[in-house]
Amino acid sequence: MRFCGTFKEGKIPYAEAEIVPYFLRFCELKGLSPFTVSLYKEKLDRFFRFLQGKTPVTSQDLLEFIGWLRERQPAPESQNIHLRSLKIFFRWAVAQSYLKKNPMHGVPMVRQRQKLITPLTISELQRLLDCARKTKQTGYRNTAIILLMVDTACWPGELCSLTLRDVRFEENLIRVDEKCGQRMLPISPSTRRALFTYLRRRKAFPREDAFFTTRHGTPLQVNNLQEIMDQLQRRTGIPRLYPYLLRHTAASSYLVGGADLETVRRLLGHTTYTITQRYVHLNQGDLARAQRRNSPVNQLR
């Protein structure tokens, strides 16, 4: 797909920052999700603000930006999100003949250690649900949120973007299309009941299309979701609790329960197995049980 802009081939009529809107429009036409386009915009804006109008961009500028980022966002993962956005942008700019050289060429990604994600235990999940159910005004909503995330491993942004049409009670399915492209995710009977129970009490806001709303009837946002988790964490005493951890917990549970990597990859909406493998976390008890179930030695007499 080639973007048709007003620039002439082989020329650089504007500073690199001025072609960012063309790049973002290209991404939209290509069908990338609003989440992805917004992410690119945020990271590119930050980089060009750092440059303060300097042009043309050089590899040295990019290395200095990495150093600047390291002081403010020490996590290598955060730095690499910026670098991936820049890499995609400059590759596009060269392919479209807006730039002759790619300043990202030879600039390495930041080395990051592989992290194992420790999921919530069944006991912690039960405490979380029990606490949510006791909340008078938002108990039905929060219960539905917890069950849906643990059942489907959906992204927080996908959950907040759900509309009334996306929840298909007759088919026991939800449709998500915020971050990883459109997917149809099955839901269990317990989750279906929780969603239906919440929906019956949500009728106070009949004109709002968003499935999950705040107490004021506005669509639930990811920051609202984090606030819900913060409140539940304080009440339950669970050491760590954030929306993504529910997704991690779901993915790990499916893998420990015997689901194959391809099934979990499709559930999570990942494009590669490398990302999915980060969710594989077996504690010693899980490992021992898996070994007893699957070792060929146990099949010998």
Locate predicted features.
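Conserved catalytic core of the tyrosine transesterase superfamily
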Residues: 1-301
